């Protein structure tokens, strides 16, 4: 083992640290301080000349340092380094590395202005650029270029949208690939077309995003007219710029609203009223849109006539003469409205037009909906909105057919009842001598009648006019099976009370008892 005294042979000759007795550990740990503690009882001079320490302090040894007595220094440190220099040597590179990482992290975060993402689906944007192309077909590179040109959001460093474009082209069945070379199906540079009939209507609508929820009015609500009718779509700068003057933004929103109003009538894929009327006009209603335009009245007049009846559709059985072209006779259908009954009043706007022109339009036809039978007297009543207008010939009422279903206001018996009113009452026991007292032709509890004596002596009940023939009655009018089953399975529920008192009252009667009927 090495002599500990040899460890201190590194002090220069004449040094105050040179001593026969080895210094204590406290002296070794604080050798670089200005005032050394009195370890050996000697007084040290305060003007200490600092010499380079040949080994690091012992505190590093306690912290896990690898100190070698042979080398007299720590591994990785020069022999002439002291505690302060050792600390700076280790912490200096760490601080420089942390600073470099912070600067690199700041350099990666680019401070650029990012445009708002368009609130449309990728399917709608792809179909839009393909339909706006002259040949209605584009390559993948052309689609990417047109989309980035039309929507500035895709001009930034974000490249994930290109994968979304490729995914929608390959997964959606509305896009079809046209091979540039049929012999090389796996080659690149093929064309893509779109089948507009397979595009979902919801995919062309404005999507629910944070931009649209914030009240942005710069984007059109529906791309269907631009995709289906090949309208030219031009991106709006106000949709992406954040520093737009309020006056310019207001003018752009007004222009877009007017554009939507003008294109709404030509759109036949939306459920707008103008679109539906346009479809009806193309079929067989040339005057439908004109009549509805005349019905658009002011709000004040609409409040006074808010309970006026809605127009009904009539199908004309005779050719009528068109008011615009007197020499041309066409067969068409028009709209008309009614006041109290089905068709005795026209709308206010249409009435004013007739009063100005002095013409009366003849409407002869049968309404699709059957009128009420008990509204005969209501046709003579006048409404304040009718004026002096009265049709030349009111529409004829449809006769009640036997195949029509009964309604709450039908004044005839439906054909599927058990017994029609033209025959005698249906009775379950034809051999019983039972006479009906009431005038009702039915044998159900709501129609049970009771005798009302007219004199003190009383009259005998009147008998049936003809014998009951159940077979012929059911052969002439087949009963409703469900009702017939109920009547035959529970006959006691529908037996007249007077029958029970007449025929089943006595105990010696040959007829079955009441318990047999129940």
Curated annotation (Swiss-Prot):
Question: Which is a Gene Ontology cellular component entry for this protein?
Answer: nucleus
UniProt key word Calcium: no
Q: Which Pfam families match?
A: Forkhead
- Chain span(s) of sequence motif Fast/FoxH1 motif 2 (FM2): 415-421
Map motif SMAD interaction motif (SIM) onto the chain: 470-491
The protein's assembly and partners: ARF1 contains 2 smad2s, 1 smad4 and 1 foxh1/fast-1 protein. Interaction with smad4 is most likely indirect through interaction with the MH2 domain of smad2. Binds to the MH2 domain of smad3, which can incorporate into the ARF1 complex. The ARF1 and ARF2 complexes are activated by distinct TGF-beta family members; formation of ARF1 is promoted by activin. Interacts (via Fork-head domain) with gtf2ird1/wbscr11 (via repeats 4-5).
Q: What is this protein called?
A: Forkhead box protein H1
Q: What is the lineage of its organism?
A: Eukaryota, Metazoa, Chordata, Craniata, Vertebrata
């Amino acid at each position: 083992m090495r002599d500990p005294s040899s460890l201190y042979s590194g002090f220069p000759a004449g040094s105050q640290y040179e001593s026969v007795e080895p210094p204590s550990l406290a002296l070794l740990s604080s050798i670089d301080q200005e005032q050394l503690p009195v370890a050996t009882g000697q007084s040290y001079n305060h003007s200490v000349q600092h010499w380079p320490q040949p080994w690091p302090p012992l505190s590093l040894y306690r912290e896990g340092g690898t100190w070698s007595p042979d080398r007299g220094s720590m591994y990785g440190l020069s022999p002439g380094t002291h505690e302060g220099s050792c600390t700076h040597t280790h912490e200096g590179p760490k601080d420089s590395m942390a600073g470099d990482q912070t600067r690199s992290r700041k350099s990666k975060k680019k401070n650029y202005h990012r445009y708002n993402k368009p609130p449309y689906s990728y399917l709608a944007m792809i179909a839009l650029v393909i339909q706006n192309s002259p040949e209605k077909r584009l390559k993948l590179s052309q689609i990417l270029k047109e989309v980035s040109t039309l929507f500035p959001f895709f001009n930034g460093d974000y490249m994930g949208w290109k994968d979304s474009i490729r995914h929608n082209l390959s997964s959606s069945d509305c896009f079809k690939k046209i091979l540039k070379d049929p012999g090389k199906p796996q080659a690149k540079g093929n064309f893509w077309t779109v089948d507009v009939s397979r595009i979902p209507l919801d995919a062309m609508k404005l999507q629910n995003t944070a931009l649209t929820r914030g009240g942005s009015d710069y984007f059109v609500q529906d791309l269907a007219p631009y995709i289906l009718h090949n309208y030219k779509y031009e991106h709006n700068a106000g949709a992406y710029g954040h520093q737009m003057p309020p006056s310019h933004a207001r003018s752009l929103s007004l222009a877009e609203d007017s554009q939507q109003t003008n294109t709404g009538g030509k759109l036949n894929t939306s459920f707008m009223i103008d679109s539906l009327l346009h479809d009806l006009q193309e079929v067989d209603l040339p005057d439908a849109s004109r009549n509805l335009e005349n019905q658009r009245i002011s709000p004040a007049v609409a409040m006074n006539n808010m309970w006026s009846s809605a127009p009904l559709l009539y199908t004309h059985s005779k050719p009528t003469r068109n008011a615009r072209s007197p020499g041309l006779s066409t067969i068409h259908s028009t709209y008309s409205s009614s006041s109290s009954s089905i068709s005795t009043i026209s709308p206010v706007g249409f009435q004013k037009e007739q009063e100005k022109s002095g013409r009366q339009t003849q409407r002869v036809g049968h309404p699709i909906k059957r009128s009420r039978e008990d509204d005969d007297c209501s046709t003579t009543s006048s409404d304040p909105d009718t004026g002096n207008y009265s049709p030349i010939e009111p529409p004829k009422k449809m006769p009640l057919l036997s195949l029509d279903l009964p309604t709450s206001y039908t004044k005839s018996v439906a054909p599927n009842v058990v017994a029609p009113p033209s025959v005698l009452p249906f009775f379950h026991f034809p051999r019983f001598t039972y006479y009906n007292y009431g005038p009702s032709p039915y044998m159900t509890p709501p129609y049970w009648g009771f005798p009302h004596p007219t004199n003190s002596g009383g009259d005998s009940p009147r008998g049936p006019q003809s014998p009951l023939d159940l077979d012929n009655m059911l052969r002439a009018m087949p009963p409703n099976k469900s009702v017939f089953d109920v009547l035959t399975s529970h006959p006691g529920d529908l037996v007249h009370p007077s029958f029970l008192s007449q025929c089943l009252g006595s105990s010696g009667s040959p007829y079955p008892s009441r318990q047999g009927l129940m």
